[in-house]
Amino acid sequence: MTALEAKEKADAAKQSLFKEAFEKTVEYLNEQIEKIASEGRYYFYAYPNDEDLIEAIGEREAKELSYNPDLQTALRKKFEADGFLVTFSRNCVFESTIKISWEELLK
């Protein structure tokens, strides 16, 4: 395998992980939005190190969600287009927080 082939293979694997993480996270967050909205709340927090999220989207995808700013931007844009405010913050090196809200948008 040449260096170029190795690079292309690595790029393809990275793109595949990005796509899987994006799709699984969108599905998970949509389920959570439906659940929280039915309870009458207007926001919720998700944590990439949370066992429920890891079980739903996968460990690799959860790590990608926590550390990939391009994935975070893509998710933010997707949900903003649907009327949700999504913010990502990092409290420390190992813990990040995702807040999804829609109350501000109702005003």
Predicted regions and their residues:
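A general, composition-driven signal for non-globular sequence regions
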Residues: M1-A3, E8, D70-Q72, V93-I98
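An N-terminal amphipathic alpha-helical segment
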Residues: M1-K63
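Well-ordered, non-membrane alpha-helical segments in soluble/globular domains
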Residues: V26, L65-L75
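Short, charged/polar micro-motifs that form catalytic or ligand-binding hotspots
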Residues: E61-P69, R90-V93
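C-terminal edge-of-domain segments
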Residues: T73, K78, G83-K107
